[in-house]
Amino acid sequence: MELRKPVSQEEARAKTTAWALTFADLTTLLLTFFVLLLVILNDAESHVDRWVNVILDETEKELRVLQQSTLVDIERVTKGIKITLTGAKLFKSLSADLNPDADPILVQIGGLIRTSTLMNIYNQKRWAPLLDMIARAQDTLNIEIRCEGHTDDKPIPMNSKFRNNWELSSARSLNLVQRLSELAEMDEHYFSALGYGEFRPKIDLRNINDRVKLEEARAENRRVEIYFDAFIKSKNESLENI
């Protein structure tokens, strides 16, 4: 009968720990796979975001014609395209009712938004690959027209129907988006309204001592900003909001 060769402690230890080494290798490979998967997904997401920014840049150029009016300023910002309207031309003092004289510029803004590249990407073949990428990821492209109202720092009189500048700025932005939606003949689900009162001034008034310059700065702060933006909403975000 053949005698078994004695096994040293080192050999026995190596055999008993061999599975652990194999398991560690598999774990490392799985970790590497998931890291690569995350990199690929992030790269795809960045690619989509870059294309959305290209669309916004193109749309901003289309809206530049609005700057021919002294009432309007256009700026490309991180929150999309910002259209700034001077408050004094839109509303009377302490009123949230739109001046009828503002209708022509609102008609122009609404028309340009309605016919813009961003609002018509589903009708243009050149954006089909982008829309296909978004659909395959089960994401959605959200288009938003958000109005933000701002006032100056003067307190609201006691006899006003508004309790404070928050209420006044909110009422103004709401009236503006409702009117813009009507004139542009666009669905209301694109629009939203916010009011910031005097708390997000365009010009800081604290270091202005000259009365004339102070009133000029206050006039700059009385404004309405319309943000025309697009962003990708992931499937997971939609599920979280249910």
Residue ranges of predicted features:
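Short, hydrophobic/amphipathic alpha-helical packing segments
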Residues: 56, 106-114, 173-177
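Short, solvent-exposed beta-strand/turn patches at coil↔beta or beta↔helix junctions
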Residues: 79-123, 154-163
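Envelope-exposed proteins and targeting segments
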Residues: 68-70, 77-81, 85-89, 94, ...
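Extracytoplasmic beta-rich ectodomain segments of secreted or membrane-anchored proteins
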Residues: 61-70, 99-142
